[in-house]
Structures are given as structure tokens and as C-alpha cells.
Amino acid sequence: MHDHLTKLYPPEQARSLQEGLQNLATDFAAAHPDLAGQARGLTADQSEVLLIAYGDQVKPRSGSPLKGLLEFMNQRLSGLTGLHLLPHFPYSSDDGFSVIDYRRVDPALGTWEDVKALGERYNLMFDAVINHISAESHWNKEFLAGNDRGYLLQSDPGMDHSLVIRPRTHPLLTTVETPRGPKHVWTTFSADQIDLDYSNPDLLYEIADVLLLYAENGARYLRLDAVGFLWKELGTTCMHLPQTHELVKLLRTFFDIAAPGVCLVPEINGTYEENAPYFGNGSDEAQMVYNFPLPPLVGPSFHTGDD
């Protein structure tokens, strides 16, 4: 971890965070020997078939939607080995990708016990929506009340943001009122989705703890949503920066200690040249990359015989 952290933080912060993350990972491994004993690296192969679905994709006659989804998969969808369970947390917009609380299951869908039951039968992929959090989250409410933990990214609108890659057309910065006066938070995707500040080591520790909760509740794949945007630095595109790759490598090292079988799957939504670097040297970064162009190309490839 040391090599990655020293590329992200000043020496004292890096040492402190390394100790914290090391303890977090080893404590988790001791408490979950079944996860800690898994083989390191990618274990999926061509036989792995995942359904992608929201938790309420199936409406059962009784019981929670998540229980209904498990029953439907067991009875109607033979041959599946896994489930990409789309965001199943309380949310405020963007079809679940504006998470209000990372640590709760949306009660309209069910409970963590329902999620665990799915994980006992299928390999689960969770969405780790860790670039941004909902404006309705506790973190933002604290910030608006004057308790700034440094988790939310702010920027001076007077600075030059012209190089920043914009995936959407709304303003990059959103002005909010706080007891300390107006503040300008970074909102890559919408005013309801406030970007997190990974230059704060306390935030990274918190996110690592959240990801362990996901592993504890059955996640075998962590789809790192919008991962290319994680680290921002003015004067750059703020996209796929070297620091972002160090963050992914750090998470890989962290999970190699805590739960080696958990597979990191960055969601890039880019070209091959942007996707491939997230594999690192083949063993030190992501095990897979979530590649949007690939699925629509599979059908024509079968039809034409041309890959």
C-alpha cells in the first residue's frame, strides 16, 4: 500500500492511512476467513453468465422484490451463475446512481439478508458508486449545516476549468448555501450528484470500509462506477489521471489482503486505449473492465462470423 499512498498523499498522511487501511483489511480477513481464503485474482471464465437487473425487476405476489428476484432466477433462468444487481441503495435520482446511503438497502427492495440470500446462490456484482453521492445524503446535509468533513469536492469558480472533460451539459460547479457562506461543489453528472474529494485520506478510508461491507454481504464483483473521474486536478482533463490508477491499484492491494476473491471492474465508458490501462501490469490493478461497446458487438459478430 505504501507505494500507492505516497503517490497520492503527503508522507505523514500516507503513513497514517496505510496503518488504518492495513488494520481494516487484516481485521476483516480475520473476521471472514472464508473470504480471506479465496484465491487471488480473476476466477471467472467463459462459463460465468450474469443477469443484469434492478432489485425490483420482478414483482412478486408476496414478499420483498429481492426475494421475488431470487425465486424468479431459480425457477425461470437456468444456466445463470451470477447477478449484476444494479444500485439497490436509497437514492434520489439517476436510476439509483445518486446514492443517499451507501450502507443501507432501499427498504422498498428488501434487506441485506435478502441480498445475502442472492449471494448464496449466485456470484453478485454490486455497483460501487464512489465518484459522487446524493445531495440528499447525510454527508451533504452535514456539510450544508456547517460540519465540513472534507468529503465533498469544492472548487473556486474563478479558477480555469476549461480542460475538464464534461460528460453532461449542466454547470460543472453547483453553488450551495452554508453557514459559512456560499460554497461551490463539484458536480460532474448533476446538481444532485456531488463529487467526492479523494485528496482527503479520511474519505478514502471511509469508502474502503463501505466496499468491505459490500464484500461481507455477497459482492464478488465491484463495478467501480465512473471511476475515470475519481481524482481531479485543475489544469488537466480530470479524467483517467495517474492518481486515479493509483487509487484502483490501492483498492486491489487492499482487497488482496481482506478478500482476494473480490474482483474490481472499473466502468470506463471509453475507447480501448482508455480501458486497457486499468489492467495495470496484469496483476496489480483491475481484474476486468466494464466495456459498454462490447455487448452490442457480440450479436453482429455471431451473425457475420467476423470478430
Can you say where each PLM-predicted feature lies in the sequence?
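A mobile, often basic/glycine-rich helix-loop segment
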Residues: 301
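Acidic/aromatic-lined carbohydrate-recognition and catalytic surfaces
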Residues: 2-205, 212, 216, 227-297
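Short, intrinsically disordered, charge-balanced linker/junction segments flanking boundaries
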Residues: 304-307
